UniProtKB/Swiss-Prot annotation:
Endoplasmic reticulum transmembrane protein involved in vesicle-mediated transport, which is required for neutrophil function. GO terms for cellular component: endoplasmic reticulum; endoplasmic reticulum membrane. It comes from the Eukaryota. This is Protein jagunal homolog 1. The chain crosses the membrane at residues 40-60, 72-92, 100-120, 138-158. InterPro entries: Jagunal (IPR009787). Belongs to the jagunal family. The gene is jagn1.
Amino acid sequence: MASRAGPRATGTDGSDFQHRERVASHYQMSASLKNEIKKLIYAHLVIWLLIAAQMCVSHLKLVSKDLVAMPYQWEYPYLLSLVPSLFGLVSFPRNNISYLVISMISTGLFSIAPLIYGTLEMFPMAQQLYRHGKAYRFIFGFSAISVMYLLMVVAVQVHGWQIYYSKKLLDAWFTNTQEKKKK
């Protein structure tokens, strides 16, 4: 469309963006942290499915005990670790602070605590494997201790980052609620 100033009206060439509003930083942070936490929850779901599959296969005796070892005691309470992740997912759509706090606390209780107990439970067998090279439990030909410790290292990192990002998300949400109260 032509104008008096030339072939294009002034301000329509894309140079008028400086005055436009921007998204507040805590909203940007909230969106990115929700995305990161969702990725961690999906990683946790994969770990949970591996442990649940190992437990189902061993309890239902689908394969011999030589192929898949019986589960350790820490694996049973770890199965409850799916509940905190569900609370975390439920808290996202409406920025529900109480569900996120429940998710953070129960992640420590149902996820981190069983992993710490599992580390202590398997330590004597890991020591025996290290000193004498003897393993008595196997998962598909690999030492069950080695496989479970590897899984535990990944799980601790996933849950640790999940709690860290949840705390940062909680701070971003509190910033948002404090600004609303001031108005």
